Amino acid sequence: MEMQQLTLVPRLMPAVRSGEKTSTIRWQEGDITMGPLRLVNQQDDTDAVIVWVTQVDTLRLSEVAATLGKQEEWPDEVLLEGMREHYPEIRLSSEVQLITHLTPAETLQKLTKQ
């Protein structure tokens, strides 16, 4: 079975690798399910990391910051501006997928235990 895959902007790859970033917000990119996910640098497909998806929530973009406890870091305007880098048409009322995953290190442990 093909592993599910998403691309990531290059500047976010180090934060995923270090385990600092454990979620991603996606809009209209198809359904991601629990299990292994390959995150690929969108400018260099040899640069990829595998993480284990633990949760997928569908919610409005306007609800994401509160769900992640980041209301102060991500006021609506900041979140919307960041998301429009990737999705120019997105709105605060758009339904997005909030994908939560293990760190690459935790994922490796999980995959080697099975």
Language model features: what each stretch is:
Residues 2-114:
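Structured alpha/beta reader/binder surfaces that contact nucleic acids or chromatin modification marks
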